[in-house]
């Protein structure tokens, strides 16, 4: 199915916002990994990534409704990723506020796993987007 001008604008906005989520989340996760301790600014980037991913996903959902282009695997993995990002953000806040120094040092293990899982729907979306234009 071909995208019209409105769909293209939604798609461009969604791609920008989802890519912002990738950048925010990557900075938070890898910043935490490199510094070997959970810090306040990592929480900010986790939350910015979650916010951008949620907004981008809602834009993508709107595009899917307009175009009737749905991919079940992308939908399921995307929902799992957002849920994990939400749990990750809550757990990060709890660990930052009440966690022991050891918990703050080891939190990055969970962050890396969540980030890797988040990449799955991101890459599926990239593949689906490229497939649309072939």
Put a short name on every predicted segment.
Residues 4-5, 123-134:
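Juxtamembrane boundary at the C-terminal end of a transmembrane helix
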Residues 1-22:
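Hydrophobic transmembrane alpha-helical segments in integral membrane proteins
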Residues 4-6, 30-37:
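Short, hydrophobic transmembrane alpha-helix segments
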Residues 27-31, 52-66, 91-98:
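Membrane-helix exit/interface motif
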Residues 16-17, 24, 45, 52, ...:
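Hydrophobic residues within membrane-embedded alpha-helical segments of Major Facilitator Superfamily
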Residues 34-53:
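Loop-to-helix transition at the N-terminal end of transmembrane alpha-helices
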Residues 64-91:
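Short alpha-helical packing/oligomerization segments
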Residues 101-116:
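Interfacial loop-to-transmembrane junctions
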């Amino acid at each position: 199915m071909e995208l019209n001008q409105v769909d293209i604008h939604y798609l461009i906005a969604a791609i920008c916002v989802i890519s912002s989520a990738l950048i925010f989340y990557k900075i938070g996760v890898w910043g935490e990994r490199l510094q070997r301790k959970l810090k306040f600014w990592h929480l900010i980037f986790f939350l910015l990534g979650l916010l951008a991913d949620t907004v981008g996903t809602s834009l993508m959902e709107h595009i899917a409704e307009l175009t009737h282009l749905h991919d079940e695997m992308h939908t399921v993995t995307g929902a799992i990723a957002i849920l994990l990002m939400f749990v990750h953000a809550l757990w990060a806040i709890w660990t930052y506020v009440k966690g022991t120094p050891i918990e703050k040092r080891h939190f990055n293990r969970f962050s890396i796993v969540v980030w890797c899982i988040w990449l799955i729907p991101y890459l599926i979306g990239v593949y689906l987007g490229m497939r649309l234009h072939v």
